[in-house]
């Protein structure tokens, strides 16, 4: 018998939506553009964009995503533009208004989206002692695009504080997001970020988001894997650029960039057909646009989600996933060891994930059991789910959630 762990859970290509630059009520990029224009001489339209994104819109957006099954990652910048910490009263809002947004986030966003910081401010690098900018021109994405590798403790503490603020606000993070170019070299960044998240949440397999690949294959890298400890740092890579209004809120909005009306063109069909994770990057500002009647990015997303559903109406080929589901599965797959006999497969699984999916060949199973518990046979891809197996040609697909590190599968 030969056995392999398939690249994706249930052998379905994951779809996922990354939402960047979001935070509690504040339009972070109003302040970003206002404060950055004098430094670099750009003429970004900061006076045209809203200062606040209302809770009502955020709730509507989250409820629509839940109804459509859309999942992904939602940034919450912990100290947006250095205005104040979200686990303390922000100067622009009353405590009731702020707590209402946080409660809405916990109830409506968290069930379907991982929460991550997008580092501390998404603008100035702050002095951790004073919580004031270190220097006017030292920004997280310019200056700390190359992290000070000789100050690993400082970088780890900086990221850990970002995570701690979210946890204090009732939003424990699953990983971290880079603001702009923040976070080189990657191996150093991955090590610091992993230590920071684990310090706050204890998560053995967090992840980071930094890179975007708009052409070619999409990987799901695993950093600093330790089989003995069962720890690793995952990385999610976006497969698209942003055509949902971008970070300004007044950028391009184009559904056809993602998937055309005939369901054949655009970036996403190519990614899906290649079997790669179809991860869309977006920015919260673009979904809302310049005002409540704009919603340019939200309209694009609604069109794209509808087209993706029409392309796979039975859900046999794709499945919406949170980013952390994708990266943790990649960690589990990379760190697993399989030892196959004639009718017995022994798995050593330092990281255990739901819906672990195997392909078996060279054997005709009479039945399939995991640790003595029989799995249910199904006849179609649409019915293939956790706790089942499916004969397909000369192979058998098996999906189950392992309960322990040493797991035995018999056929």
What is the predicted role of each segment?
Residues 1, 7, 197-223, 261-352, ...:
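C-terminal domain-boundary segment and adjacent tail
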Residues 1-9, 16, 22, 28, ...:
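Active-site-adjacent pocket scaffolds in enzyme catalytic domains
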Residues 1-72:
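N-terminal regions that are enriched for targeting/export leaders
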Residues 19-21, 74-78, 117-121, 177-180, ...:
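A cross-domain feature marking catalytic cores of carbohydrate-active enzymes
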Residues 26-50, 132-149, 298-302:
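A solvent-exposed, charged loop/short amphipathic helix patch at secondary-structure junctions
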Residues 42-69, 90-109, 154-161:
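Aromatic- and glycine-enriched glycan-recognition loops and surfaces
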Residues 49-56, 79-100, 123, 127, ...:
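Acidic-and-aromatic substrate-binding clefts and catalytic sites of carbohydrate-active enzymes
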């Amino acid at each position: 018998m030969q056995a392999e762990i398939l690249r994706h859970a249930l052998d379905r290509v994951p779809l996922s939506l990354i939402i960047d630059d979001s935070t509690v009520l504040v339009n972070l990029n109003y302040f970003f553009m206002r404060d950055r224009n004098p430094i670099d001489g750009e003429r970004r339209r900061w006076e045209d964009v809203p200062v606040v994104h209302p809770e009502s819109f955020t709730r509507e957006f989250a409820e629509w995503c839940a109804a459509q099954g859309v999942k992904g990652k939602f940034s919450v910048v912990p100290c947006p533009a250095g205005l104040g910490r979200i686990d303390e009263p922000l100067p622009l809002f009353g405590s009731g208004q702020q707590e209402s947004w946080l409660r809405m986030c916990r109830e409506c966003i968290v069930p379907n989206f991982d929460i991550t910081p997008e580092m501390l401010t998404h603008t100035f690098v702050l002095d951790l002692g004073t919580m004031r900018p270190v220097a006017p021109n030292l920004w997280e994405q310019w200056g700390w695009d190359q992290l000070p590798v000789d100050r690993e403790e400082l970088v780890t503490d900086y990221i850990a504080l970002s995570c701690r603020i979210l946890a204090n606000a009732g939003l424990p993070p699953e990983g971290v997001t880079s603001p702009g170019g923040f976070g080189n070299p990657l191996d150093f960044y991955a090590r610091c970020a992993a230590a920071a998240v684990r310090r706050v949440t204890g998560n053995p397999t967090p992840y980071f988001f930094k890179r975007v690949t708009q052409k070619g294959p999409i990987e799901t890298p695993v950093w600093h894997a330790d089989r003995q400890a069962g720890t690793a740092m995952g990385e999610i890579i976006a497969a698209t650029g942003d055509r949902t209004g971008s970070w300004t809120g007044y950028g391009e909005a184009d559904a056809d960039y993602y998937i055309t009306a005939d369901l054949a063109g655009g970036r996403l069909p190519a990614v899906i057909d290649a079997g790669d994770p179809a991860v869309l990057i977006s920015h919260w500002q673009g979904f809302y646009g310049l005002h409540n009647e704009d919603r340019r990015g939200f309209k694009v997303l609604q069109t794209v989600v509808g087209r993706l559903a029409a392309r796979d109406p039975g859900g046999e080929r794709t499945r919406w996933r949170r980013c952390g589901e994708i990266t943790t599965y990649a960690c589990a797959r990379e760190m697993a060891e399989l030892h196959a006999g004639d009718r017995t497969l022994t798995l050593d699984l330092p990281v255990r994930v739901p819906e672990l999916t195997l392909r078996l060949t060279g054997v005709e199973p009479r039945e399939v059991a995991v640790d003595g518990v029989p799995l249910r046979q199904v006849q179609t891809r649409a019915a293939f789910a956790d706790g089942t197996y499916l004969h397909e040609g000369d192979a058998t697909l098996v999906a189950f959630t392992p309960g322990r590190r040493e797991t035995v599968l018999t056929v």
